[in-house]
Amino acid sequence: MAQRYRIETQQYNEAFSDLESNCNEITFVNKGQAVYLNGVKMDNGDAIMIGGNAGEFCTTKFACVPSTPGNIEVYVIKKIYS
């Protein structure tokens, strides 16, 4: 049986420390200076996708900080079941 879901996209221009995923899949795309996502370095143009199987629900909290002082440009894309 098909399940309904929606896609949410959010742009972040400042560091964040407790972004709750609360979704089935989440993707981070860095379009600015280098950042650290939960300790993993992401350079400009890098993307990290965390996928889930049908029925799974991720509750991980994510933190994103710039590698040097300044603003960031990170896009967060979530797949959320209705």
Predicted features along the sequence, with ranges:
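Exposed regions on extracellular, virion, or secretory-pathway luminal proteins
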Residues: 1, 40-44, 69
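Tight coil/turn sites that cap or link beta-strands
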Residues: 10-12, 40-53
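Short, surface-exposed beta-strand/strand-loop-strand elements in extracellular ectodomains
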Residues: 29-44
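Noncatalytic modules at the cell exterior or secretory-pathway interfaces
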Residues: 22-26, 56-72
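Surface-exposed ligand/attachment interfaces on beta-rich extracellular proteins
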Residues: 4-21
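Short intrinsically disordered terminal tails
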Residues: 1, 81-82
